[in-house]
Amino acid sequence: MDKLIQTLISGLSLGSIYALIALGYTMVYGIAKMLNFAHGDIIMVGAYAVITAVFTMGLPPFIAILISIALCALLGIVIEFLAYRPLRQAQPLAVLITAIGVSYLLQNLALLIYGSEQKAFPMIVALPTVHIGGVYIDGITLATLVVTAVIMVAISLFINKTRMGKAMRAVSEDKEAAELMGISVNRTITVTFAIGSALAGVAAIFYGAAYTYIRPTTGAMPGIKAFTAAVFGGIGSIPGAMLGGILLGVIEQLSKTYISTLWADAIVFGVLVVVLVVKPTGLLGKKISEKV
């Protein structure tokens, strides 16, 4: 029984990281209707920013975190302006190819600057481990869960209650109509990318704290799985991203513990296929009908 509970806790830890990354994915898609497949690599950039700020520049961890989040937000703005804005009216395939290109560009730039060897991630803060019987709960697991839940609520309130949030919803519904109403579509989408990329910076902190080492390809697989989590929960749904991330992490850890680590990824993606066959919009996604 302790083994099962410990596995579920490990799944919550992994899933909360996926959920945090998926929140950025689903926010950008929900507002801009674009899939930023370079999102995972922005996490890698954020992690390297912390490493550089702490070990090279000698800055305190808290300052390094702020720099990392700000850098990720700025990088998101630059990527949107240079790579995605010119393709706003292009076919989805063109946007997809561009996103993959941006992803490889970031990975190779990191490879040139930091080399292929993994770098140790600094300890940001020492969190105590909670022991309950034969089960232990790592402090970083609790912190990630709490922060992810708080961010999910904050984003939901921001989108539904603030002026910019209402502008985002209007742009999501109809860009042309929003522009006619005086809403700056470019500014709204830029802010969306900035917030989504800042969330990637937050995810970088918790990913680095949990796995302690970073390499140029660090963000690739977590990015893909977080995208899977967003689709699983319902792409465009903020609560869906949270639910999808948690469930995906739990399924992956259960697969590794009770089936095989070799089959874990296949099982995760297999479950996604089954969910999409049964409910194409994801667990919390809403079916939208359009008049032609």
Predicted regions: what they are:
Residues L14, Y136-I214, I238-G244:
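Helix-loop-helix "hairpin" substructures at the membrane interface of multi-pass membrane proteins
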Residues I9, I31-V78, L82, G234:
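Membrane-embedded helix boundary and interhelical linker motif in transport proteins
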Residues Y18-L20, G58-A70, F193-A200, A204-G270:
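Transmembrane alpha-helical segments in multi-pass inner-membrane proteins
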Residues A47-I51, I69-L75, I100-A110, V147-S156, ...:
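Hydrophobic core segments of alpha-helical transmembrane domains in multi-pass membrane transport
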Residues P86-K161, T188, T212, L254, ...:
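Transmembrane helix-bundle core of multi-pass membrane transporters
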Residues S16, Y25-A47, P61, Q89-A94, ...:
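Short, non-helical or kinked segments that cap or interrupt transmembrane helices
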Residues M1-I21, A49, P60-A64, A90-V95, ...:
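Membrane-interfacial amphipathic/re-entrant helices at transmembrane-helix boundaries
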Residues Y25, G58-V102, L109, L243-G244, ...:
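Alpha-helical transmembrane segments within multi-pass membrane transporters and channels
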